[in-house]
Amino acid sequence: MNFSTTLLQWFAKNGRSLPWRETSDPYAIWLSEIILQQTRIVQGQSYWERFMKLWPTVSDLARATTDEVLKAWQGLGYYSRARNLHTAAMQIVERGEFPKTHKELKTLKGVGDYTAAAIASIAFGENVAVVDGNVYRVLARYFGIDTPIDTTGGKKLFQELAQSLIPSDQPANYNQAIMDFGAIQCTPTSPHCDTCPLCETCIAFREQHIDSLPVKSKKVKQRVRHLTYIFIQHQGLTAIHQRGAGDIWQGLWELPQAKHLDSIGEDTWKGHAQLVCKDVKHVLTHQILLADLYLWTPQNRPPLPEDFIWSPTETLEDYAYPRLMEILLQAIKKDERDLLCKKKSTITKQSTPFCNVKGRRLQCKRCPFDV
């Protein structure tokens, strides 16, 4: 029995049941592929369901605003995917129909070889192989290939090999089979070789170098970046601004950084601010961010760049933030909760502590500032 046939038989018994596999709608399939880039299925499925509920068709998504799309995407990371998704939706609507071929699909914003191959094969039955991390791993181990997968030659070799293996009558099932096989059976660490239907003919298993394949020649260098944020609260309003192009988190909102207060000098605000948390670590692909957060309640509004707005503090959740900013805002809520808890209105040895919040006495476990 050959490699492809074995994979298809394994898939028939072990393939994952996923909602976007129950439809031939190219919009639903495309949406799933974009969401699942750099995202685990267990997390991505809820976002797919959210997007399908908010925007059931590509026309609905095209009519949404960028801010609405970013807000719905919040928490998934790699926000350029959301911006590209929205742009591509508008491209499709402008053209009048969904692209049907691998070549046409690649003209959409944010759609590369892998995504185009997945959509073309699954939605339209085109005989084109997908090559992603799972596929690299399965093929490298089974065929014993030590050519680095992140080189031009390596990418070409694996793409040609993958294409030679795909059965012309089942491109959708085969592509989904090899991706599921890599995710479930031939995992990056601790693969399940004892139950693998391919182990008898797998070169890496036979030669005992499973852990060394696939090979990468480059290591991502991460630089450490220190950021200082200030939660400025004035008369129930908080300063925020939307990040521009040229750096991380384009289009997302954030609190002022220390650099935004250069006109008044650090000594002016820092002497009156409270340190809420220090060196909050957030890891990105190429950067390690370490963030400090201060709380400052000045008597007068400080001068800030023109792109800042003053939002009512209670409506801050309406904006789309990067994950680091979500963590810092949660820290502010917790800090406020802790301050309130120091002013408990009624505390006895026999009673449950209460806080006086907006004129109501609430148990701490029900406190709205509890995070």
Residue ranges and their predicted role:
Residues M1-R16, E22, A183-V371:
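Intrinsically disordered, low-complexity, charged terminal extensions of DNA damage-control enzymes
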Residues F3-D194, L198-D211, V224:
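Catalytic cores of DNA base-excision repair glycosylases
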